[in-house]
Design a protein with these regions (language model features):
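A short, Lys/Arg-rich alpha-helix, primarily the initiator
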Residues: 1-23, 27
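Short, charged recognition helix plus adjacent turn
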Residues: 2, 16, 68-80
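Residues within the alpha-helical elements of helix-turn-helix
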Residues: 20, 31, 59
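Residues in the helix-turn-helix
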Residues: 27, 38-39, 66
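Short alpha-helical "recognition helix" segments of helix-turn-helix
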Residues: 28-29, 56
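Recognition helix of helix-turn-helix/homeodomain-like DNA-binding domains
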Residues: 31-49, 73
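DNA major-groove recognition helix of helix-turn-helix/homeodomain DNA-binding modules
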Residues: 51-66
């Protein structure tokens, strides 16, 4: 399992994309079909589940991929 520092980076990437999309946390959660979570506050007491990260990446307004949100990968060839 990833350490807290890497989950903090996941939060930062999700938050940046959310802001770019002009969405509130409530709107993002609704569009992704997930519940509001304490991790959305930015406090390192919890983190999104893998399933939540996948669902957030699938929100069209986010214009991103799971690989970017989870690992910061922008070039999918880096996955090989």
């Amino acid at each position: 399992m990833a350490n807290n520092a890497s989950w903090n980076n996941v939060y930062k990437r999700i938050n940046a994309k959310r802001k770019e999309a002009g969405l509130t946390w409530n709107q993002l959660a609704s569009k992704a079909g997930i519940k509001m979570g304490s991790w959305m506050t930015g406090l390192p007491i919890s983190h999104p589940t893998e399933e939540e990260v996948h669902k957030i990446a699938d929100v069209p307004e986010m214009n991103t991929t799971y690989a970017y949100l989870r690992y910061g990968i922008t070039d999918l060839s880096e996955l090989n």
